[in-house]
């Protein structure tokens, strides 16, 4: 790796988040650089950002131990010309060579190199390799315009270093983006988009041609939980679909890649946090509301309950006189929109 990194133009990390005392204490310490490796560990990619011309901003921590401390960091205020300049570098580990990729598309753009989703079975492993999203020959990254209205999902060829936009989003409003889901190593991509006014998933081929919209309707899809490539089923979380529920409550769903067979897996008027095994066979569903005892159950991938797992014991809490808050729903001033809230009353 080149040794020309300097403060605010360094590889992988610029030291942001340190106060004035920590800057002095850590001046000679080696810093961890965030890199993403190819699956065969022959290459790695790292981002570099040049913020040297960006003006300083400050935060004073007045509640630190002893004297207040000062944190200085780079921040572009609205209307200022100088912006951070993001770069992506690709390195050949054996050859000890690297090159800056030509990622230019938008003025003052921001970049995001996507990592491979972690396996749930690796959750408790002390060492978990940081791999890029892709394979030994390619990886995926995103670039976003400064005004947040243009986004490219790109694929990078490792050998040539060329960058190809696969999916492009162009709107007159703020655009959000998520890491794409790869099917069969990138032969197909599952892309999250708000192009129809709601957050939904879309199926693209490897060249960026839209095959079909997977989910649709007046609800918000949140995250990809699992992709069953063989069965061509997508498991995902969403909210706002179930009638007469708080629209902020999350649920787990399954749907076929062609958009058919949409099914709610963890029914119940609760906020759900679901964890699925890597083989997409079973789900641990934790659920509760602010006025209920948290519970967890084991489900299969069709939503059938296999067994009860745990119910939280709040008996000691209740002996203190604790009372659950009370959820409520009222109409907004327009007389149509429901507003959800929680009322906390004194215990006495």
Specify the residue positions occupied by each region the protein language model found.
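Short consensus segments that form the blades of beta-propeller domains
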Residues: 25, 76-82, 120, 142-146, ...
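Short loop/turn segments that connect beta-strands within beta-propeller blades
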Residues: 93-96, 158-161, 205-209, 256-260, ...
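A short beta-strand motif characteristic of beta-propeller blades
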Residues: 23-24, 99, 117-120, 164-168, ...
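Predominantly five- to eight-bladed beta-propeller fold
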Residues: 2-36, 43-114, 302-317
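Non-catalytic accessory segments flanking enzyme active sites
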Residues: 45-48, 54-55, 81-87, 101, ...
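Signature of short aromatic-glycine-proline-rich micro-motifs recurring in repeat-based ectodomains
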Residues: 14-39, 115-132, 178-187, 191
């Amino acid at each position: 790796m080149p040794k020309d990194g300097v403060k605010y133009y360094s590889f992988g990390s610029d030291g942001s988040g340190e106060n004035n005392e920590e800057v002095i204490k850590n001046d000679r310490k080696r810093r961890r650089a965030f890199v993403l490796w190819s699956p065969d560990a022959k290459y790695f990619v790292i981002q570099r950002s040049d913020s040297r011309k960006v003006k300083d901003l400050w935060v004073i921590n007045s509640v630190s131990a002893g004297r207040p401390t000062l944190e200085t960091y780079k921040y572009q205020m609205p209307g200022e010309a100088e912006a951070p300049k993001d770069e992506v570098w690709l390195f050949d580990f054996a050859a000890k060579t690297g090159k800056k990729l030509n990622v230019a598309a938008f003025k003052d753009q921001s970049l995001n190199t996507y990592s491979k989703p972690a396996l749930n079975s690796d959750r408790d492993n002390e060492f978990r390799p940081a791999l890029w999203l892709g394979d030994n020959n390619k990886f995926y990254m995103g670039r976003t315009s400064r005004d947040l209205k243009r986004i490219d999902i790109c694929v990078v060829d490792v050998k040539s270093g060329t960058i190809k936009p696969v999916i492009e989003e162009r709107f007159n409003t703020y655009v959000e983006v998520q890491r794409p889901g790869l099917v069969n190593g990138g032969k197909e991509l599952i892309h999250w988009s708000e192009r129809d006014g709601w957050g939904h998933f879309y199926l693209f081929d490897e060249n960026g041609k839209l095959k079909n919209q997977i989910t649709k309707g007046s609800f918000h899809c949140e995250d990809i939980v699992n992709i069953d490539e063989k069965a061509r089923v997508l498991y995902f979380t969403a909210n706002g679909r179930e009638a007469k529920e708080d629209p902020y409550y999350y649920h787990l769903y399954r749907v076929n890649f062609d958009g058919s067979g949409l099914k709610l897996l963890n029914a119940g008027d609760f906020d759900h946090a679901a964890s699925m095994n890597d083989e997409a066979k079973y789900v641990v569903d934790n659920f509760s509301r602010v006025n209920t005892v948290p519970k967890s159950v084991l489900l299969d991938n069709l939503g059938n309950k296999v067994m009860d797992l745990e119910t939280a014991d709040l008996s000691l809490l209740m002996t203190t006189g604790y009372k659950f808050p009370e959820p409520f729903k009222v109409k907004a001033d327009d007389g149509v929109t429901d507003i959800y809230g929680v009322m906390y009353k004194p215990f006495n």
